[in-house]
Amino acid sequence: MLELKFMRENVEMLKEMLKNRNSNVDMDAFVELDSKRREVLSEVENLKRERNNASAEIANLKKEKKNADHIIEKMGEVSTKIKDLDAELVEIDEKIKDIQLNIPNVYHPSTPIGPDEDYNLEIRKWGIPKKFDFEPKSHWDIGEDLGILDFERGAKLSGSRFVLYRGAAARLERAIINFMLDVHTLEEGYTEHITPFMVKAEVCEGTGQLPKFEEDMYKTTDDMYLISTSEITMTNIHRKEILEQAELPKYYTAYSPCFRREAGSYGKDVKGLIRLHQFNKVEMVKITDAESSYDELEKMVNNAETILQRLELPYRVIQLCSGDLGFSAAKTYDLEVWLPSQNKYREISSCSNCEAFQARRMGLKYRVPNGSEFCHTLNGSGLAVGRTLVAIMENYQQEDGSFLVPKVLIPYMGGVDVIKK
């Protein structure tokens, strides 16, 4: 969330930013409402001043045993007017807050300007995609042929975009999760969490999923929301708190299932594990001061890269352009892993610095010598587990339909080094 003072002082800049972000938030409506609010506030203050002066005059008249009925009657009308204007102020404030909550974060100056992913900037590549001497299969064909991924029964249980993992696939998914958490906690200093999978609306509002993306979230009958990422829960751990600067940065990680309606993705990735309503993810979250957040973003990207490098999966790092940037992010790097069956790189991690945008929404601050400042929050996939399984199955596949287990995962698989019939 942006500060109102900042919004008032940067209307034209924000109009340009919103255009570059493909956002249709109406800044002219904000300017009109803000101007109206100032008018109403001024009128309320004048009326309250008049009422206060009249109260003193009434007291003097009564002291002098003089009639004050005409003033009392007039002040009754003034009080009614003040009450009406206060109600109007509440209505105006709600409209301003709605605009404020729907304005995306201001992007970092280094962000490429462009309407869509075609304008993203490739930063670097790692690894060389393997050349197969046979036609590489898709992960869903490999999984179904081996009997370890069952999309038909997943759909029978829950509908489209659900899958049933069986045997080696279930074990490998668990191995991937444990491997990722071990690297992040034992080597990189993250503290592991197991968080709730359902949260209050105000928690989703804090990280920016609400109100803008409500249609993409699952809501329970008692107004709780299933988390679409554990970024939501971990970033909100310290909501409405003031931390000591010496405590920062905080490094948090968690595995969780994630639940997404995938609204607006009709027809995209309808087969396989790439786009599901329920999937597993290991998430990284950092809470930092304002000075160190961009250094911490680079470290977070490196943390995600470490997983891919240990798994020996070819990938590239791209910086997202203005039109492809997430709502709460000021700067984002995506990691895209190579998928042989698609002959292209696909997103497997997104690492973002949200600066003070989320912290301002959730009231998360840290102490400084002359008061307090809003924390900066960062989040990143470390990694999306199902997509990691996809990349392993496709990049490690063999001509006979089996696929190898990456060396670093063999100990987590009890010594199993190949998945076959």
UniProtKB/Swiss-Prot annotation:
Catalytic activity of the protein:
tRNA(Ser) + L-serine + ATP = L-seryl-tRNA(Ser) + AMP + diphosphate + H(+); tRNA(Sec) + L-serine + ATP = L-seryl-tRNA(Sec) + AMP + diphosphate + H(+)
MF GO annotations: ATP binding; serine-tRNA ligase activity
One Pfam family it belongs to = tRNA-synt_2b
> What keywords does the record list, in alphabetical order?
Aminoacyl-tRNA synthetase, ATP-binding, Cytoplasm, Ligase, Nucleotide-binding, Protein biosynthesis
Tell me where it resides.
Cytoplasm
Respond yes or no to whether keyword Protein biosynthesis is given for this record. yes
Please list the residues that bind L-serine.
Answer: T229, S230, E231, E283, S381
Q: Which EC number applies?
A: 6.1.1.11
Q: In which pathway does it act?
A: Aminoacyl-tRNA biosynthesis; selenocysteinyl-tRNA(Sec) biosynthesis; L-seryl-tRNA(Sec) from L-serine and tRNA(Sec): step 1/1
Set out the biological process GO terms recorded for this chain's protein. selenocysteine biosynthetic process; seryl-tRNA aminoacylation
Q: Name one GO cellular component term.
A: cytoplasm
Coiled coil where?
A: none
Residues engaged in binding ATP: R260, R261, E262, E347, I348, S349, S350
Note the PANTHER family from the entry: SERINE--TRNA LIGASE, SERYL-TRNA SYNTHETASE
General function of this protein: Catalyzes the attachment of serine to tRNA(Ser). Is also able to aminoacylate tRNA(Sec) with serine, to form the misacylated tRNA L-seryl-tRNA(Sec), which will be further converted into selenocysteinyl-tRNA(Sec).
Give the domain section of the comments: Consists of two distinct domains, a catalytic core and a N-terminal extension that is involved in tRNA binding.
Family statement: Belongs to the class-II aminoacyl-tRNA synthetase family. Type-1 seryl-tRNA synthetase subfamily.
- Subunit note: Homodimer. The tRNA molecule binds across the dimer.
Under what name is this protein listed? Serine--tRNA ligase
Organism listed in the record: Fusobacterium nucleatum subsp. nucleatum (strain ATCC 25586 / DSM 15643 / BCRC 10681 / CIP 101130 / JCM 8532 / KCTC 2640 / LMG 13131 / VPI 4355)
What gene is behind this protein? serS
